[in-house]
Amino acid sequence: MSKDLEVAGRYANALFQVAQDKDLVDVFSEELTELKAALNANKDFVKLLENPTFTTEQKKNLASAVFEKINPTLRDFIYLLIDRNREDYLSVIADVYQKRVNDLRGVADADVYSVIPLSEQELTALSRVFAAKMNKTKLNIQNHIDKSLLGGVKVVIGTRIYDDSLKTKLKDMERQIKA
C-alpha cells in the first residue's frame, strides 16, 4: 500500500467512524461523491487549494465559500485537512470512504467489458450472479465496450477477473493445440 493511500485511508476511516456515530454515513457519501466530481471538473480550484503561497486561513475561507452547502461536520473535516496540509488527499479520501460505505452495505463495484453495450436485463442478470459469487448484496456495474474481446464478457471485481470472452477462449485453444 502506498504511503498516500495509507494516510488517506486513516482519514477516511476516521471520517467514516464520525459519520456512523452521528448517523450521517449516507449524507457524507452523497456529499463526498459530489465533492469529488466538483474537484475533478474544476482543476483550477484544486490548484488554488493546494497553492503553498495561500495561508491556511485563506484556504479555509475559499473552502468555506465553495463548500457552504455541505454538512458542517464534513466542512470541519475539510478544514482539518487544510490545517494539516492534507487537502490534496480529499479525492482519495472520498474513494476510500465510499469503499467503506460499500463494504458496510454489502455492495461491490464491477467493470464489465463486452463487445456491444449490454441491456439492463443482461446487466441485472450479471449483477445477480456475481453478487452471489462474491457474497455481496449488490454490484454497481460499469459497462465498458472492448471490441478486442470478439464476443462474450470479461468481469472485473476488485482484483478478481472472470474472463469468458471469445478472445481468451481462442487463446486457450491455441495453447492447447501447441502443447
Swiss-Prot record:
Keywords per UniProt: ATP synthesis, Cell membrane, CF(1), Hydrogen ion transport, Ion transport, Membrane, Transport
Compartments in which it is found: Cell membrane
Gene Ontology CC annotations of this record: plasma membrane; proton-transporting ATP synthase complex
Membrane topology: Peripheral membrane protein
Disulfide bond entries: none
InterPro entries: ATP_synth_OSCP/delta_N_sf, ATPase_OSCP/dsu
GO molecular function: proton-transporting ATP synthase activity, rotational mechanism
Signal peptide as annotated in the record: none
Domain of life where this protein originates: Bacteria
Primary localization: membrane
Pfam families referenced in this protein's UniProt entry, alphabetically: OSCP
Family to which the UniProt record says this protein belongs: Belongs to the ATPase delta chain family.
Subunit structure: F-type ATPases have 2 components, F(1) - the catalytic core - and F(0) - the membrane proton channel. F(1) has five subunits: alpha(3), beta(3), gamma(1), delta(1), epsilon(1). F(0) has three main subunits: a(1), b(2) and c(10-14). The alpha and beta chains form an alternating ring which encloses part of the gamma chain. F(1) is attached to F(0) by a central stalk formed by the gamma and epsilon chains, while a peripheral stalk is formed by the delta and b chains.
Biological function: F(1)F(0) ATP synthase produces ATP from ADP in the presence of a proton or sodium gradient. F-type ATPases consist of two structural domains, F(1) containing the extramembraneous catalytic core and F(0) containing the membrane proton channel, linked together by a central stalk and a peripheral stalk. During catalysis, ATP synthesis in the catalytic domain of F(1) is coupled via a rotary mechanism of the central stalk subunits to proton translocation. This protein is part of the stalk that links CF(0) to CF(1). It either transmits conformational changes from CF(0) to CF(1) or is implicated in proton conduction.
The protein's name: ATP synthase subunit delta
